[in-house]
């Protein structure tokens, strides 16, 4: 959610050389702060990174309720000031009121805050913690306690480095 493409286009137009240096996105920092894995077996294998429409619209097909219908893990940027509407759109898309959610304020900063809540309590939680901007909203059952263990470490699972054993 920046303007790097426009900046690179201008640099190219002006024949100014540049490098693009990769960084760690705040959505990864938020996962670390939450001590969470966004993809869990039989919970969610996809992560949707998006934002609410605000001063800048989003394409119609990327409306929050349509994306929420996938029931994937969602990481929502630039939407902290619209949490009542966000909750409504998430519920309209099929999440339940008690779906786990979190607000991560200033992920990876010294003054980081991590607030666990539900889809229904997003706005209330932000208000209680005086969070009005600079936060990510994470939604999905990846934040819950129910998941299946990965087959990767199951003794009967064969992969490149190990032949599975049959269980008795």
Regions from the language model: what does each represent?
Residues 2-10, 14, 44-46, 54-168:
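A contiguous loop/helix-start segment that scaffolds small-molecule binding in enzyme catalytic cores
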Residues 1-53:
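Short glycine-cluster motifs
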């Amino acid at each position: 959610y920046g303007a790097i493409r426009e900046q690179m286009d201008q640099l190219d137009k002006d024949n100014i050389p540049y490098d693009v240096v990769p960084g760690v996105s705040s959505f990864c920092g938020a996962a670390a702060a939450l001590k969470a894995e966004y993809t869990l077996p039989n919970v969610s294998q996809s992560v949707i990174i998006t934002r609410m429409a605000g001063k800048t619209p989003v394409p119609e097909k990327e409306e929050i309720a349509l994306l929420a219908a996938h029931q994937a893990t969602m990481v929502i940027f630039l939407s902290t000031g619209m949490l009542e509407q966000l909750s409504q759109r998430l519920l309209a898309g099929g999440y339940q009121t008690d779906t786990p959610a979190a607000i991560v304020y200033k992920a990876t900063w010294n003054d980081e805050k991590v607030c666990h809540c539900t889809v229904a309590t997003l706005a209330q939680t932000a208000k209680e913690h005086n969070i009005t901007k600079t936060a990510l909203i994470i939604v999905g059952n990846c934040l819950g306690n129910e998941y299946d263990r990965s087959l990767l470490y199951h003794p009967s699972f064969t992969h490149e480095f190990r032949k599975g054993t049959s269980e008795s």
